Amino acid sequence: LWRKTYRIRLEGAAVTPAEVIAVWKQRFAGFWPADSRFHSPDGGLTPGVVVLLDQLLPGHLRLSSGVMILYADEVSFTVMSAEGMPFAGWNTFSAFEEDGVTVAQVQLLMRADDPLFELAMVAFAHRMEDRHWQQTLHNLAAHFGVQAPVKYQTVRLDRRRQWSKAGNVWYNAAVRSALHTLAARLGPQRPTSTPIRRR
């Protein structure tokens, strides 16, 4: 079980925490890195809404899954991962004032969902997650005309691995996305037009 915290100080930007969160909610997908897609619903990021997302994995595989908006107020919102996501847990996006400067923050509480994702975390997933949220915060800060470093901290809260949850592999979104892509490539080729029959 891990807690990861990423934050960026919006030094020099005359913007309140509430204004940062309002923009972040409205343009959430636009702040994501270019290789990831977040399909924001028309009604906005409101509690109870399920949002679809696509992320590029190593090997040019695309993971398709979703998150549910668990909570939202003027200065924060929280999403919870759907079944089959690499990590079970939630992400909280918030903004607050610190020493007269508005700070934007992403905090994750996460545990690998199955043994395959446990192995992926060691191999590459932690680094991917770090790059993703650092880039997201850089993009958010750039919207307000700020270039600043992202400070981040990773804390391991529980060293135990839940091997008893091996059955969750059945719901693994990366495996299912890969099988869907493979089936689409190897499936029967459909003609683009109906051939003309001669009599």
Model features per residue range: what roles?
Residues 58-99:
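Hydrophobic-ligand binding "helix-grip"
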Residues 22-30, 84, 100, 138, ...:
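Short, intrinsically disordered, mixed-charge
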Residues 53, 77-80, 104-106:
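Short hydrophobic/aromatic-rich beta-strand segments that constitute the beta-sheet cores
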